[in-house]
C-alpha cells in the first residue's frame, strides 16, 4: 500500500508547519505553527511515533456540530488536527488514514519553493 508524506512548509508569517498527506494528496492532518524548522521536524517525529495508536486521537465538534479530531502526544499536547467532516464516520475514516500514513518517513520540504 502506498504511503503518504509530510509536507513541511512556511506559513504566511514565516513560521513553519506541516501537513500529513495521504497517497491521494489529500491533507489528513495539519500541525500547529512552529518558530523553527527543528521544532516542526520534532512535530513530524511525534506524529510518526503517536499517530499509529487510536488512543492518541480525540474527537471533537466545532460550533456548527461538524466533527473533527486532534492527535495528541503522550504528554497530552496537541500535535495536529483534521479538517471538519460531515459525519463522525467520515472523521473515523480520517483517523484510520492518519494511522495508516503516520509512519511514513517521506518529508517533502517546500520551504524553499
Curated annotation (Swiss-Prot):
<feature type="repeat" description="1">
    <location>
        <begin position="11"/>
        <end position="59"/>
    </location>
</feature>
<dbReference type="InterPro" id="IPR010879">
    <property type="entry name" value="DUF1508"/>
</dbReference>
<dbReference type="Pfam" id="PF07411">
    <property type="entry name" value="DUF1508"/>
</dbReference>
<comment type="similarity">
    <text>Belongs to the UPF0339 family. Duplicated subfamily.</text>
</comment>
<feature type="repeat" description="2">
    <location>
        <begin position="62"/>
        <end position="110"/>
    </location>
</feature>
<dbReference type="InterPro" id="IPR051141">
    <property type="entry name" value="UPF0339_domain"/>
</dbReference>
<dbReference type="InterPro" id="IPR036913">
    <property type="entry name" value="YegP-like_sf"/>
</dbReference>
<keyword id="KW-0677">Repeat</keyword>
<protein>
    <recommendedName>
        <fullName>UPF0339 protein MS1092</fullName>
    </recommendedName>
</protein>
Amino acid at each position: 500500500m502506498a504511503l503518504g508524506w509530510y509536507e513541511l512548509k512556511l506559513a504566511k508569517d514565516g513560521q513553519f508547519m506541516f501537513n500529513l498527506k495521504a497517497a491521494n494528496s489529500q491533507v489528513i492532518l495539519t500541525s500547529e505553527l512552529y518558530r523553527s524548522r527543528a521544532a516542526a521536524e520534532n512535530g513530524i517525529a511525534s506524529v510518526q511515533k503517536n499517530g499509529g495508536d487510536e488512543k492518541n486521537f480525540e474527537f471533537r465538534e466545532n460550533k456548527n456540530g461538524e466533527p473533527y479530531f486532534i492527535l495528541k502526544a503522550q504528554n497530552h499536547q496537541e500535535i495536529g488536527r483534521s479538517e471538519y467532516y460531515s459525519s463522525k464516520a467520515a472523521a473515523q475514516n480520517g483517523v484510520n488514514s492518519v494511522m495508516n500514513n503516520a509512519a511514513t518517513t517521506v518529508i517533502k520540504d517546500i520551504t524553499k519553493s
